[in-house]
Structures are given as structure tokens and as C-alpha cells.
């Protein structure tokens, strides 16, 4: 196999930079890109371990939204989100681990929270965000999920990530996962923004 010469590599890097602009996260080709550019208000994205589920929701948060809430069932599980976000952002500057709040230089706010007990959902009553992410959605109860997303408005978005058998592509969900959807009898509720 022949590798690129340093000048060719530099030229390739320049082409990539020109195409991606100021994006801190660029989705992988295929399903992750489809999910990233989906206009669905509720986005279910799944796959095998290491398939980029957490990367997708972190990338959406950093590149596309201003007020973000990211959830795991247990607060200790948030470490994976912190690690992925710091990789995308480039540092942990602005992250307050005591509060679970990340304030970025451009004014973005990313809140990280565990929703361990059923009653913990109440803490999010009336708390709007332009992106609500649930990492490992199958760990949450349907009630927790529906209550928390209930505070989204017409231009808001919810993204979920789950392991393999639940969700197969960016906008389809198999029946086992459908109980988290607002329209449980259907495979997924997809509301398109205009």
C-alpha cells in the first residue's frame, strides 16, 4: 500500500477543512450522517457498542444547539458523556463537575444529569432546551422519557441513543423501543419541522 506524501496529506487536510468549516464534530459516513442531518423532532439512533451513538448526540449538542440537556439513568454514567464532549470540544474548560454544567465560550450551555429515581423527572419540569439527549434510552422508564420531553416546544429536538436491537437507523425504531415513543403503537413518532 502506498501512503500519501506530506504535501498530499496537507492538501487533503485543507480540502477536509474547507468542507467541514468550523464544525467541531463531523459525523461518520452512513447512518450516523443520516441521523445527524435528520429533521425529525424525535430521533432514535442505535447500534452496536462503539458504533458512535454517544458521539452523535455529543456532536449534535456541540455543533447544532445552544441550550442542551443530556441524560443518563445514573449520574455516575455521565463520565462517558464528559469524556466524549471533552474530546469534541478539545478540553474541559467551562465544565463544572459539581453542577454538571458545561458553559462554552459562545454561550452554549450543556447540562448533564442522572435520572435515577422515577421522581427525578420532576426536576426537569418546565425546563426547556433546544436539545434533550437520552444516552442509553432503554435504561429510562417510558414515564421519565415522556415527562422530560413534554417540555419541548415546536422547534425543539429530542435525540436518543440505544444499543443494538432497539433502534436500527436514524429514524426507525423496532417495537421493543417503541414504548419510549410518544406514539407507541407506531414504530416511531416523526414530526418534521418546516
What are these regions (language model features)?
Residues 1-194:
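Short, flexible loop motifs at catalytic/binding sites
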Amino acid at each position: 500500500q502506498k501512503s500519501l506524501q506530506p504535501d498530499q496529506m496537507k492538501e487533503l487536510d485543507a480540502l477536509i477543512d474547507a468542507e467541514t468549516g468550523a464544525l467541531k464534530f463531523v459525523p461518520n459516513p452512513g447512518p450516523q450522517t443520516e441521523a445527524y442531518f435528520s429533521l425529525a423532532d424525535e430521533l432514535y439512533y442505535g447500534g452496536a457498542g462503539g458504533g458512535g451513538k454517544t458521539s452523535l448526540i455529543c456532536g449534535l449538542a456541540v455543533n447544532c444547539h445552544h441550550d442542551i440537556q443530556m441524560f443518563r439513568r445514573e449520574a455516575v454514567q455521565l463520565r462517558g458523556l464528559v469524556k466524549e464532549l471533552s474530546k469534541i470540544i478539545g478540553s474541559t474548560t467551562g465544565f463544572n463537575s459539581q453542577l454538571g454544567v458545561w458553559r462554552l465560550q459562545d454561550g452554549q450551555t450543556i447540562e448533564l444529569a442522572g435520572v435515577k429515581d422515577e421522581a427525578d423527572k420532576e426536576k426537569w419540569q418546565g425546563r426547556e432546551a433546544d436539545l434533550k439527549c437520552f444516552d442509553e434510552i432503554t435504561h429510562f422508564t417510558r414515564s421519565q422519557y415522556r415527562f422530560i420531553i413534554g417540555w419541548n416546544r415546536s422547534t425543539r429536538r429530542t435525540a436518543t441513543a440505544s444499543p443494538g436491537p432497539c433502534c436500527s437507523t436514524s429514524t426507525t425504531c423496532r417495537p421493543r423501543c417503541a414504548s419510549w415513543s410518544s406514539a407507541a403503537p407506531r414504530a416511531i413518532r416523526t414530526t418534521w419541522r418546516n
